[in-house]
Amino acid sequence: MDSQKSQSSAMQIAEDMQETRAPELPGAGPVRRRTFLRGIGAAGIALSAGALVSDTVHAEEKSGSLTPGDAAILRFLAAAELIETDLWQQYAELGGLQTNEPPQITGLTTGNAAYTKALSNLDGDMATYIHDNTEDEFSHAAFINAYLKSKRADTVNLDQFRRLPSSQATGAQQIGRLTNLMELTVDTSWFTRYRSRTGNPDLGDSFANAIGVIGTKRHTAIPRNDNEAQLDPSSPNGVTDLTQFIANTAGFHFAFIEQGGTSLYAQLAQRVTNAEVLRILLSIGGTEIAHFQTWHDKAGNAPALKGVVDPVSGDTVDFPDLTTFAGNEDLQTNLIMPEPTFFLSKSFPVCSIIRPTATTNAAAATLKSFTDDGLFRGQGDDFFRYVNDLAEDADAARRGF
């Protein structure tokens, strides 16, 4: 290859490695991602493609046999799993099976009887499912970090950001949290998206919230105190309407979280280079799909409620009667398997698929969805800068780099 062609190839690689600016999170500020070309000036661009890649690998980090892109993707996934372990731990403390399984699950005590009862109205096995989902997320985070360490790549630790308050309800540990489950605005558009027979977010389509009441303003998905977790033998649900509304919100939030992981692993798998890393993403991603399918099914059992007063906001809210969705294929609760829809192009036959799976800004979009959900209300700018940086690195990854 002559020098002109070499320079042209290297410049093309540099152009290919530039990513559309990822959407910034609130509080993130003008943080620039640690691009894989950091430190390579104009003279460096004139290097051959092989030399450029070699210098990049050594300049960015010691990542063993991992490419910087694979390491960046795994780090973002480790952070996402740590965030999930934090929120699932809170659900497990209050509504899960109270069985400690070190090192994955610790700190469980008595649980919260009223909240657990309210969740059981969605399914009698909810406590077990919550416990198992929690254990799974802990195992994912621990494995990914251990794998990164084995490859001499940087790992992820979010302990410095565990600063958000805990619920004061019986069963909750009084420790710092990464996530806030008490001021959520739950996106339920996944419910209509997976029932659509013509729409696909990867093709520019948008979807309405199925449960509008929890998709506006702020709602708690765990009891904030014992006044919000009350048994009521006179109620058909065995708990107060407020406690049941909180559990209904949680039921839809469970599915929201896991549908995000379902897409994220499929999206980032398309960018990894190493076959073993691909195996990791496909293997863990499959469990996210199993989680989503479970919660999708249980959410549809949430009982109807009328005139529930939120003691914090003062709002009076109703939870819709989901049995009225019967016969409406856009909303029917038992249609939990993805309806076939357009994929890649509307010129192809419809196909039952996970959606979305397009890769552009996938990590940043995941963080934005968590932020819009209210998971990070109360977190500081330093947290947003850190996780936004991880997302930008993951989104900049390309197969082969």
Predicted feature descriptions by range:
Residues 35-56:
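N-terminal export signals
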Residues 2-31, 41-42, 57-401:
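All-alpha RGS (Regulator of G-protein Signaling) helical domain and cognate RGS-like helical scaffolds
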